[in-house]
A protein has these predicted regions:
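Transmembrane alpha-helices and adjacent helix-loop boundaries
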Residues: 1-406
Length: 406
């Protein structure tokens, strides 16, 4: 009976996600269907910018929650693994025809290979074949980005996973900062382009379908990051709900008891760390696609703290909490509070404080209020289906109480 209920819940969740993805496609193409639609529905509007960034950040936040929330390992190396993913993706997908221009300061690239050209030689570079080549190169590069991040996580995991609590956090944060410095090293310029940005690789706008005249007939630049994020988060959910996930939670709750139960602590910690880093690497590649470039100086410790803040706001140990918190965090910081940065006059009176930067002051106060009133985060350690089921149960109990009173 319980298994049937679980299957129904899982089926309903997949149907809901499919419906949400279709809705996003329709929403992004609303101005094509109805040319007179409000400006907010234009594909270049702030609404879709927020959705793209939220999709990328939600994946990274969930990957961090897998490690911090479900396994109890406090790591601050997320920005470093994102950097590895972003650069792996960019280096593999910059076409050979653009490498001389991108690496002009170094006389060209040392990497004489491009996935786009490799697949283009098989499927073609224009028309339907060109689209297939581009899609395959992106998918393979995303997987490679995750694998490179996971490999480096395995390398540093051997020594650092012996550490606990703050010491592990400091070690992983140091690793991320070292990586950022190395990737800006001029000696590696022919590979990483030094302190300069890598560009000219496929981005989310590359998935927009155009007519022969060059006009866009179907926008998919928001659908694709959401699709990638949904698929990756679904894999993390499956892992958390598996026997491995239960082992992670046992380690988080009590390492001594978990080891007494026969759980191999070192192996499961490494699995969690490597898996989290894999998805952080994929998230880094998606971030590069979002900003249309890869540059090491962007992946600072501040980015890691942002992701950590999102995890705390959503609830440590809640995947749906991380997704909801990401959407709220990005929408507030990038969109809803933008009006606070503009100088405002009421007649001849200038409204005080409203100027560039005031938005972040108010945003910080909002975060403090949320943390004060939601000590365990918005969702705590619960998931959205549990919360909705609880609401339904309470509503049903209230109705039953009213009927009994009558």
């Amino acid at each position: 009976m319980l298994n049937d209920t679980s299957k129904k819940t899982s089926r309903a969740a997949w149907l809901w996600l499919a419906g949400a993805l279709v809705f996003i496609v329709l929403l992004e193409n609303l101005t094509l269907i109805f040319p007179g639609a409000p400006a907010i529905f234009k594909p270049t509007s702030q609404l879709f910018t927020v959705l793209k960034k939220a999709a990328v950040y939600s994946l990274v936040a969930v990957s961090m929650n897998l490690l911090n929330g479900f396994t109890g390992l406090f790591s601050l190396g997320q920005a470093g693994f994102m950097l590895l993913g972003a650069y792996t993706y960019a280096i593999l997908t910059v076409p050979m025809s653009a490498k001389d221009q991108v690496y002009y300061l170094y006389g060209g690239s040392a990497v004489k290979f491009s996935l786009q050209d490799a697949f283009g030689a098989v499927f073609g570079t224009s028309g339907f074949g060109g689209a297939v080549s581009m899609i395959l190169s992106v998918v393979v590069a995303l997987i490679a980005a995750g694998c490179v991040a996971a490999f480096f996580a395995w390398l540093i995991g051997l020594p650092v996973l012996r550490l606990k609590s703050d010491y592990l956090a400091i070690a992983t944060l140091g690793f991320a900062e070292i990586l950022r410095a190395i990737f800006q090293w001029q000696a590696l310029g022919p590979v990483t382009n030094g302190a300069n940005m890598l560009k000219s690789f496929p981005t989310f706008t590359s998935f927009n379908i155009k007519s022969a005249s060059g006009s866009t007939v179907l926008y998919l630049s928001t659908f694709m990051p959401v699709l990638f994020a949904v698929l990756c988060i679904a894999l993390i959910v499956m892992l958390v709900n598996s026997t491995y996930g239960r082992a992670f939670k046992a380690i988080r709750d009590d390492e001594v008891a978990a080891e007494a139960m026969g759980i191999n602590l070192a192996r499961h910690k490494m699995l969690s760390f490597v898996t989290s880093s894999f998805f952080a690497g994929v998230g880094g590649a998606l971030f590069a696609m979002y900003v249309a470039n890869a540059q090491a100086k962007v992946f600072t410790s501040t980015m890691t703290y942002e992701i950590l803040l999102i995890v705390v706001i959503g609830g440590i140990g809640s995947i749906s909490g991380s997704v909801i918190a990401t959407l709220l965090y990005v929408a507030c910081s990038e969109w809803w509070l933008r009006f606070l940065d503009a100088e405002t006059y009421i007649g001849a009176f200038k409204v005080p404080l409203l100027r560039n930067g005031f938005r972040m002051v108010v945003f910080s106060v909002v975060i403090m209020i949320v943390v004060l009133f939601f000590r365990k985060g918005i969702m705590g350690d619960r998931e959205l289906p549990e919360v909705i089921a609880g609401w339904k149960t309470k509503a049903k109990a209230r109705r039953s109480g009213k009927e009994a009173a009558e």
